[in-house]
């Protein structure tokens, strides 16, 4: 099985920042990978929230340097929302993959079995998250873009410039 690759074309402020390409671990966490893949393509249409099940146009609302860049809340835009292709939330599939370093792609949650659409890209090793957040992919191209996003973050997570996924899809 070949794992799917997806992309985000990013803007920081009003400038194009470049493309992030991510490999999804469909061989290890197929349900989690499929959720993210389908949210990249937008192929599932409108969700229960009444909003498109699509990352296009959504922001990275929380960026903490030397930790992570978080996005995926396309319903509220501020970290309180989001929705999966399976309904509002879905279970933790497994914790086989670990938060081993920069570029790891993991699900943001609010406790066990509360995965939706929010995710984060690690900018450092974050082993304290192992067993709590499902790792489902990794950045394979565009880590420089992630580093540029990291530069507009702060200790509080607030960004100094708007960080937006202006386009996304599957390669």
From Swiss-Prot:
Recorded catalytic reaction(s): these are: [protein]-peptidylproline (omega=180) = [protein]-peptidylproline (omega=0)
Report one GO cellular component. Answer: cytoplasm
Q: Name one GO biological process term.
A: protein folding
List, alphabetically, the Pfam families matched. Answer: Pro_isomerase
List the subcellular locations. Cytoplasm
Q: Which domain of life is it from?
A: Eukaryota
| EC numbers for this chain | 5.2.1.8
Answer yes or no on keyword Cytoplasm: yes
Q: Function of this protein?
A: PPIases accelerate the folding of proteins. It catalyzes the cis-trans isomerization of proline imidic peptide bonds in oligopeptides.
The text of the family note is: Belongs to the cyclophilin-type PPIase family.
**Annotated protein name in UniProt:** Peptidyl-prolyl cis-trans isomerase
Source species, please? Brassica napus
